[in-house]
Amino acid sequence: MTARYERSAALYERAVARIVGGVNSPARSFKSVGGGAPVFMARGQGPYLYDVDGNRYIDYIGAFGAGMFGHGHPELVAAVARAAEGGTIYGTPNPWEVELAERIHQALPSMERIRFVTTGTEAVMSAVRVARAFTGRPKIIKMEGCYHGHSDFALIAAGSGPSQLGTPDSAGVTEGVAQDVITVPYNDLDSLGEALDVWGPQVAAVLVEPIVGNFGVAMPKPGYLEGVKRLAHAHGALLIFDEVITGFRVAYGGAQTLLGIEPDLTTLGKIIGGGLPLAAYGGRAEIMDWVAPLGPAYQAGTLAGNPLCMQVALTGLEILSRPGVYERLDADAAYLADGLVRSARSHGHTVQLGRAGSMFTLFFCDEPVVDYRTAQRSDPAKFAAMFRGLLDRGIALAPSRFEAWMLTVQHTRADLEETLQIADEVFAQMAGQ
């Protein structure tokens, strides 16, 4: 590692001695972009990150989708200070959780009843549990390559075909768990129908990202989500939308509002916390009323609904509800993404674009990405070269070809212009290698 990252390298040496792999989430590791020490950030301001060596970066990591507001947003900073003065955790109900639940229901009417949790993993795990309780069925169908957190059932890879049960995709996940998970390709109604024809009477729910953000950004084909809902309901299964990434990202009311399709249950996370750890799950009242204390599906959390997160979340949603916010984000993302595509292609690189609102992915492959298998064709070496070239010039991306570029409410057109100029230099350098 060069002198530019000298302090990051020193911190990484210390980190690997006490923190597993030197990082607190594998997504932060540089393993897939050539290895070595990741960059350690010391502070953020607006759309910028500053590392421990004093280097400035235009931030498109966006905290993997959670950082919709940029860094140090003055209204959120004030909300944190104001809330903290009144105490950060009570262990009792509080008025702000009621107000936040009402605000979320206004944005996503399908969420008639809501329960707050701390992480997206908890939200999905809890939604699946109540779906199983409500239907009395054990199995879940999910889509290949879609990440739903790190609970055991979510870490099941596809079997040899849509009628086959999955296999564990992580050490420590048992074959017993895998027996209750079927994985089929995204955007493939035939495979979903085949799986339901075989396992339908045992399937509690079909779990899907309505717009994929976890193998890069991929949109549903026309009619796909309508077909998923129709097939699920025809077999007595529920439809769960995992909107941990897309909720309040692609539209104020998430993908379900943007696309006009309501699920039975929804999970939210990332953005709703305003930068603090907060997630939620909810849906039709008749289903959610199976959750304790009303029903037999148990779920609880010491930090759930704490007053600090509730008040900051309310401030965040107030910011996002203002006129023109999403229109500007969409226009800025289109400007940047389209400019990157033109630049890359002008230097001879074959790229495909997946974009939904203010998140997008550049895939280094020769055909549009519609599912995980086409996403895997994106050239890892080319992504790594782009990632490193941008990083060395002050542009920060998530270190994976399957992650999205994330815009914030604090990026300006000047930031986008600077990014395009730097990216053009990088694409030119890559073409000459």
Curated annotation (Swiss-Prot):
Q: Which of the seven top EC classes does this enzyme belong to?
A: isomerase
Q: Which domain of life is it from?
A: Bacteria
The record lists the catalysed reaction(s) as: (S)-4-amino-5-oxopentanoate = 5-aminolevulinate
Would the keyword RNA-binding be found if you checked this record's keyword annotation? no
Biological-process GO terms, alphabetical: protoporphyrinogen IX biosynthetic process
GO CC, any one term: cytoplasm
In this UniProt entry, the residues modified to N6-(pyridoxal phosphate)lysine are: 270
Checking Pfam families in the record gives: Aminotran_3
Record key words, sorted: Cytoplasm, Isomerase, Porphyrin biosynthesis, Pyridoxal phosphate
Record GO terms (molecular function): glutamate-1-semialdehyde 2,1-aminomutase activity; pyridoxal phosphate binding; transaminase activity
Q: Where in the cell is it found?
A: Cytoplasm
Pathway entry: Porphyrin-containing compound metabolism; protoporphyrin-IX biosynthesis; 5-aminolevulinate from L-glutamyl-tRNA(Glu): step 2/2
**Record's InterPro entries?**
4pyrrol_synth_GluAld_NH2Trfase (IPR004639), Aminotrans_3 (IPR005814), Aminotrans_3_PPA_site (IPR049704), PyrdxlP-dep_Trfase (IPR015424), PyrdxlP-dep_Trfase_major (IPR015421), PyrdxlP-dep_Trfase_small (IPR015422)
Enzyme Commission numbers on file: 5.4.3.8
Residues of the signal peptide: none
Major localization listed first in the record, in broad terms: cytoplasm
Xref: CDD domains: OAT_like
Instruction: Decide whether keyword Membrane is in the record.
Output: no
- Cofactors, names only: pyridoxal 5'-phosphate
The family database entries (PANTHER family) matched by this protein are listed as: GLUTAMATE-1-SEMIALDEHYDE 2,1-AMINOMUTASE, GLUTAMATE-1-SEMIALDEHYDE 2,1-AMINOMUTASE 2
How is the subunit organization of this protein annotated in UniProt?
Homodimer.
Q: Which family does it belong to?
A: Belongs to the class-III pyridoxal-phosphate-dependent aminotransferase family. HemL subfamily.
Which protein is depicted?
Answer: Glutamate-1-semialdehyde 2,1-aminomutase
Lineage here is: Bacteria, Bacillati, Bacillota, Clostridia, Eubacteriales
